[in-house]
């Protein structure tokens, strides 16, 4: 349950939240509660959802004019759950390569505040996360 996950995140030491967008909507984990957030997929609304379908029909290009802006907003909210104040630190891992392979990916990249961005292979991901955890990240 979300309550159990919240309890684990606040009681445990170093933590990584890996979940769906519903986990970060309305969640405030300020401070050291959350060290890393892994986003497996860009948070696009489900096109088959009747509400999403109805809203998309209001636009000439529902994907570009509705789905992308909605996903970018959710993406920004996800990042915001990790970094809540000027003193918070964390790693935001995006596993969805569409952020660099699709034309709309730049909209997601521009939605992030100024921060260090690294594009790494999956083989280098865990060593990079370990160096961040150990304080040797450069």
Give residue ranges: language-model regions:
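ASCE RecA-like P-loop NTPase motor cores
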Residues: 1-138
């Amino acid at each position: 349950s979300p309550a159990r996950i919240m309890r684990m995140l606040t009681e445990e030491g170093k933590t990584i939240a890996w979940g769906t967008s519903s986990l970060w909507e309305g969640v405030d984990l300020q401070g050291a509660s959350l060290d890393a957030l892994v986003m497996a997929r860009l948070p696009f609304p489900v096109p088959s959802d009747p509400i999403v379908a109805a809203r998309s029909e209001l636009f000439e290009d529902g994907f570009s004019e509705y789905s992308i802006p909605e996903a970018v907003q959710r993406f920004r909210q996800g990042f915001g759950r990790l970094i809540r104040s000027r003193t918070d630190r964390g790693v935001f891992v995006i596993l969805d390569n569409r952020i660099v392979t699709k034309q709309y990916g730049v909209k997601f990249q521009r939605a992030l505040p100024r921060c260090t961005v690294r594009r790494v292979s999956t083989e280098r991901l865990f060593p990079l996360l370990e160096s961040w955890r150990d304080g040797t990240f450069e």
